[in-house]
């Protein structure tokens, strides 16, 4: 509007236009601007103000799943923390007291490894002797210092993302109060009878010399040796089976010295087979008689290079439990002289293998379960039920594996040892090997060392899943940890809902929880035991002893357990009894699983969380846990078990999970591929708000993708949103809220936009309540770009810029834009936390000191007008046809601006014609004039196939161009005082003149 004339005497109409004015820059400069906003949040104690203004509201507590205090944050951390921040901010603005106390997981093997590497191995120093109390405590202090360093580094990195929380008072599992409470939680399990020491096969890391939980392993591709092995039948001693062998298949030949049984299934059809032809040098010999599953016999003979065989007869499965075999290594070094029974097991299938499963109770959960289930019967039959310890902590076979002592399953570096080949060689020498091969399959690896783990029988501490829990010394039949956990899952809200089935399956099928680790840096299993001589132990239950332990931990930390004289100190007057101090430490998942106890239930250290009363307890407060989907077997899982075991219910009301972050091609990120995205670099280059927008624009329930192109698109989306905010701020520079126009006095277009505002408000509030941030971003982007910028703002620019100061239409438009700006800044605040804060301070310097202290706007339902919206659907359909026609004219260079046009719209439908009767289509279509005609249009008229009965012919606008508004009108020149403008613009100039503005 208004163009400068070459004639210097021409009027300067620009100063009479209400053009946008704002200090909100077009270029965001987020990397430079965001740190200033962070500083201001600290200066005004934003988190404290949030708590103060929300006092008395229902609490919504997002309990932070603690990241590990080791190294800088990665893109997965950024996504997780941003999601949490969006939850807490949006719940606060929905009317809750939304608390967020950040936390860290500080104990465990990764930190031990770093200390050993940096402080010992790299310097050629020997690792401390943990039997020495002073050395143990000194090493733990090194670990504590390391964790504290990275906690502080990560804290600053998380704050830079715009995360608002109680950063000055975070929780950490290594603080003294936390260690004390973790010990108390363990004591509760001891008191209710579910804590026990037993000998069971557990996943063992040879490299790290410790037991691992399921949550500490990753399944990776691994190639294993496979063998088909013959177990000669010894009973019955006569008949068809007397010369036969039962054939098993295994991917772990090294476990064969630990074999004590063969499992079969009474649901499988078995047969007796005889080899009638085989190569002379074959392991499988002509004349061998074998028992196999009928379904698998052909494949077994193929692997054994058998050229001909015959089926002798079927063998009823229900007769197999009477069969006994000799061990295939019988006689080696004087060992393996025991009977190998056949046991019926539900875990046996005929999908692969032979239909029989080699059963080594010291090397597998199912093996252990079936062996112990049959132990009493086996003893009656004269078969010892003792489980051997055939592999030691170094992955070496022991003296209980005669002939193989010292052979390594895995060496200290995690590489394959010589045990497999030694066992296979012995099988060949005894004519017990039928075939061998190699199999690539998924196998458990340590999440830290990335090396394969083994299953080995070892004394460990467990929490029982299926023992009746004895609260207050009284046990109720069926009240088990598994039953409690499954019930708790059913009353928890899972987002997305599929998470419920996932964790239900895990809890339903999981073994007892192994909670002991043979390491140094952690909370000790702070109990005293009396040995029973069979690997189990009696746990001392003594309130006075327990109180001395927890009080010491509270003041001195868990290092007190390792100090000289700890046994005597804590046992007190019971020190003369035969109680031993346990040296193992707790699984770190027990630490983090106990965080609810020392964060949500400790108002002394976390006063903002005082008096939480959850809906599950008859209150009105809500606790949410939010982590990646892998935490169904991690933190969600351990927290559920810990809380159900000690409190009878889950520690959470809502559990939200997100997927993993991949590169933009859908590949897993790795340094070797060079496809990682460093959040620190994104922040440095583009700003944290770009990362925040990316997080909220993705479907977090699935795996997310990120990379240069995706970030480029995110920046473009951000630019459009920022420009819309900037235009609103600039336009509102001229708004006096004292001149706001009442809804009933507004033009139709303004009332339509308030109807749209009401619709958008309902959508945004619902999406935030459902944690559906993708819908929030997508709907707001569409609303701001399409509904506002491309439609409403475009139409109203002439009114806003050129109307006289007294214009009711201009004031009505400003009133609507004020409501739009207020709502949009608040709606976007949880997502674009820095940008909206910057805009808010310019928009409402007289209001709350931060947009994050506001609430989302209440319902705009009083603005709803469905009939008006339906009418304007017709108007917009006509507008779309006119716009299409104008684009063709512009492309043909018959017009430049749309203001050079005067379209003629032909409308065939009389009802539609009535709808358009009172609409200023020139204003709506941004043309200088307009004409609507009833009836059919000429053949050359422009049409759109999706708008029936409307056609447009574009003619040039008649008249003279207004020097102020650029409209071409026949009335330009009719005002003698201002002959080069339209009457509307002449009136505006007179009002400006009265205000002292001359041109």
From Swiss-Prot:
The encoding gene is ileS
User: What is the purpose of this protein?
Assistant: Catalyzes the attachment of isoleucine to tRNA(Ile). As IleRS can inadvertently accommodate and process structurally similar amino acids such as valine, to avoid such errors it has two additional distinct tRNA(Ile)-dependent editing activities. One activity is designated as 'pretransfer' editing and involves the hydrolysis of activated Val-AMP. The other activity is designated 'posttransfer' editing and involves deacylation of mischarged Val-tRNA(Ile).
Kindly state the positions of the motif 'KMSKS' region in this protein: 668-672
| EC category | ligase
| Compartments (UniProt record) | Cytoplasm
Q: Which PROSITE patterns match?
A: AA_TRNA_LIGASE_I
Its main localization is cytoplasm
Answer yes or no on keyword NAD.
no
Q: What is the organism field in this record?
A: Nitrobacter winogradskyi (strain ATCC 25391 / DSM 10237 / CIP 104748 / NCIMB 11846 / Nb-255)
Q: Name one GO biological process term.
A: isoleucyl-tRNA aminoacylation
Report residues binding L-isoleucyl-5'-AMP. 627
Q: Which GO terms describe its cellular component?
A: cytosol
Ordered alphabetically, the record's keywords are: Aminoacyl-tRNA synthetase, ATP-binding, Cytoplasm, Ligase, Nucleotide-binding, Protein biosynthesis
The residues the record assigns to binding ATP are 671
SS bond partners: none
Q: Which SUPFAM superfamilies match?
A: Anticodon-binding domain of a subclass of class I aminoacyl-tRNA synthetases, Nucleotidylyl transferase, ValRS/IleRS/LeuRS editing domain
Notes on the domains? IleRS has two distinct active sites: one for aminoacylation and one for editing. The misactivated valine is translocated from the active site to the editing site, which sterically excludes the correctly activated isoleucine. The single editing site contains two valyl binding pockets, one specific for each substrate (Val-AMP or Val-tRNA(Ile)).
According to the lineage, what is the superkingdom? Bacteria
What's the protein here called? Isoleucine--tRNA ligase
Q: Where is this motif: 'HIGH' region?
A: 67-77
Q: What is its EC number?
A: 6.1.1.5
**Similarity comment text for this entry:** Belongs to the class-I aminoacyl-tRNA synthetase family. IleS type 1 subfamily.
Pfam families documented for this protein:
Anticodon_1, tRNA-synt_1
MF terms in GO = aminoacyl-tRNA deacylase activity; ATP binding; isoleucine-tRNA ligase activity; tRNA binding
> InterPro entries, from UniProt?
aa-tRNA-synth_I_CS, aa-tRNA-synth_Ia, Anticodon_Ile_BEm, Ile-tRNA-ligase, Ile-tRNA-ligase_type1, Ile-tRNA_ligase, M/V/L/I-tRNA-synth_anticd-bd, Rossmann-like_a/b/a_fold
What assembly does the database describe for this protein?
Monomer.
Question: What does it catalyze?
Answer: tRNA(Ile) + L-isoleucine + ATP = L-isoleucyl-tRNA(Ile) + AMP + diphosphate
């Amino acid at each position: 509007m208004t163009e400068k004339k070459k004639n210097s005497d021409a009027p300067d109409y620009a100063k009479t236009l209400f053009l946008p004015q704002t200090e909100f820059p077009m270029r965001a400069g987020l990397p430079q601007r965001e740190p200033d906003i962070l500083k201001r949040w600290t200066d005004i104690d934003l988190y404290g103000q949030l708590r103060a203004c929300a006092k008395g509201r229902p609490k919504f507590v997002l309990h932070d799943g603690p990241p590990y205090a080791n190294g800088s944050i990665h893109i997965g951390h950024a996504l997780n923390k941003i999601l949490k921040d969006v939850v807490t901010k949006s719940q606060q603005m929905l009317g809750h007291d939304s608390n967020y106390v950040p936390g860290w997981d500080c104990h465990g093997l990764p930190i031990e490894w770093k200390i050993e590497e940096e402080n010992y191995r790299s310097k050629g120093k020997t690792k401390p002797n943990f039997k020495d109390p002073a050395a143990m405590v000194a090493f733990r202090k090194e670990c504590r210092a390391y964790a504290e360093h990275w906690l502080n580094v990560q804290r600053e990195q998380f704050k830079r993302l715009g995360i608002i929380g109680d950063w000055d008072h975070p929780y950490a599992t290594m603080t003294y109060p936390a260690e004390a409470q973790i010990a108390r939680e363990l004591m509760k399990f001891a008191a209710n009878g579910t804590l026990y020491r037993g000998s069971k096969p557990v996943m063992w890391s040879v490299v790290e010399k410790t037991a691992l939980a399921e949550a500490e392993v990753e399944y990776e591709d691994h190639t294993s040796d496979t063998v088909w092995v013959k177990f000669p039948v010894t009973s019955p001693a006569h008949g068809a089976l007397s010369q036969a062998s039962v054939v098993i298949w295994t991917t772990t030949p090294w476990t064969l010295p630990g074999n004590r049984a063969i499992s079969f299934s009474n649901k499988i059809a078995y047969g007796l087979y005889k080899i009638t032809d085989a190569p002379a040098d074959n392991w499988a010999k002509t004349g061998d008689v074998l028992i196999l599953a009928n379904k698998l016999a052909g494949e077994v003979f193929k692997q054994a290079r058998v050229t001909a065989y015959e089926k002798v007869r079927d063998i009823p499965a229900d007769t197999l439990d009477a069969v006994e075999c000799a061990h295939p290594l019988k006689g080696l070094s004087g060992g393996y002289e025991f009977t190998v029974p056949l046991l019926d097991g539900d875990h046996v299938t005929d999908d692969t293998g032979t239909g029989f499963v080699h059963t080594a109770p010291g090397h597998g959960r199912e093996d252990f379960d079936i062996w112990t289930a049959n132990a009493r019967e086996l003893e009656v039959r004269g078969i010892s039920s003792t489980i051997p310890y055939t592999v030691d902590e170094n992955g070496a076979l022991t003296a209980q594996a005669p002939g193989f002592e010292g052979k390594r399953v895995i060496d200290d570096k995690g590489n394959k040892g010589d045990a497999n080949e030694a066992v296979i060689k012995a099988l060949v020498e005894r004519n017990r090997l039928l075939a061998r091969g190699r199999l690539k399959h998924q196998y458990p690896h340590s999440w830290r060392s990335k090396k394969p783990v083994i299953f080995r029988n070892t004394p460990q501490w467990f929490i029982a899943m299926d023992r009746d829990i004895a609260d207050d010394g009284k046990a109720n039949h069926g009240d088990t940890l598994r039953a409690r956990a499954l019930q708790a899952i059913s009353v928890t809200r899972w987002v997305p809902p599929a998470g419920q089935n996932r964790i239900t399956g895990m809890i339903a099928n999981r073994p007892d929880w192994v909670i002991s680790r043979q390491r140094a840096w952690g909370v000790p299993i702070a109990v005293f035991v009396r040995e029973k001589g069979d690997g189990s132990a009696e746990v001392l239950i003594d309130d006075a002893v327990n109180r001395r332990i927890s009080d010491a931990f509270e003041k001195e930390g868990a290092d007190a357990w390792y100090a000289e004289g700890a046994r005597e100190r804590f046992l007190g007057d019971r020190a003369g009894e035969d109680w031993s101090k346990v040296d193992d430490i707790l699984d770190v998942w027990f630490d983090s699983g106990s965080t609810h106890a020392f964060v949500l239930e400790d108002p002394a250290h976390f006063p903002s969380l005082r008096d939480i009363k959850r809906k599950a307890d008859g209150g009105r407060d809500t606790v949410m846990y939010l982590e990646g989907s892998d935490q169904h077997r991690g933190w969600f899982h351990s927290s559920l078990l810990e809380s159900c075991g000690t409190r009878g219910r889950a520690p959470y009301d809502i559990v939200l999970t997100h997927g993993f972050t991949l590169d933009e091609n859908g590949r897993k990120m790795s340094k070797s591929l060079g496809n990682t995205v460093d959040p620190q670099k994104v922040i440095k280059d583009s700003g944290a708000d770009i990362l925040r927008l990316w997080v909220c624009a993705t479907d977090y329930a699935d795996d997310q993708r990120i990379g240069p192109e995706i970030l480029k698109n995110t920046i473009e989306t951000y630019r459009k949103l920022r420009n819309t905010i900037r235009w609103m701020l600039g336009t509102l520079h001229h708004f006096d809220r004292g001149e706001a126009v009442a809804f009933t006095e507004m033009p139709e277009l303004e009332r339509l936009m308030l109807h749209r505002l009401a619709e958008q408000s309902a959508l945004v509030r619902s999406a935030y309540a459902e944690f559906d941030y993708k819908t929030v971003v997508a709907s707001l982007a569409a609303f701001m770009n399409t509904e506002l910028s491309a439609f409403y703002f475009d139409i109203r620019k002439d009114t806003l810029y050129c109307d006289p100061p007294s214009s009711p239409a201009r004031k009505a438009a400003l009133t609507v834009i004020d409501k739009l700006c207020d709502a949009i800044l608040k709606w976007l605040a949880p997502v674009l936390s820095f940008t909206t804060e910057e805009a808010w301070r310019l928009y409402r310097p007289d209001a709350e000191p931060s947009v994050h202290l506001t609430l989302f706007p209440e319902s705009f339902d009083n603005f709803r007008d469905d009939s008006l919206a339906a009418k304007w659907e017709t108007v917009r359909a006509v507008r779309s046809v006119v716009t299409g026609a104008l684009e063709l004219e512009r492309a043909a260079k018959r017009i430049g601006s749309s203001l050079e046009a005067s379209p003629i719209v032909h409308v065939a439908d009389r009802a539609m014609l009535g709808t358009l009767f009172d609409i200023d289509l020139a204003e709506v279509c941004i043309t200088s004039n307009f004409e609507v005609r009833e009836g059919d249009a000429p053949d050359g008229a422009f049409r759109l196939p999706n708008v029936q009965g409307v056609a447009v012919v574009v003619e040039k606008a008649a008249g003279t161009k207004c020097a102020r508004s650029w409209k071409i009108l026949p009335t330009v020149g009719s005002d003698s005082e201002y002959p080069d403008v339209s009457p509307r613009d002449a009136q505006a100039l007179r009002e400006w003149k009265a205000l002292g503005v001359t041109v």
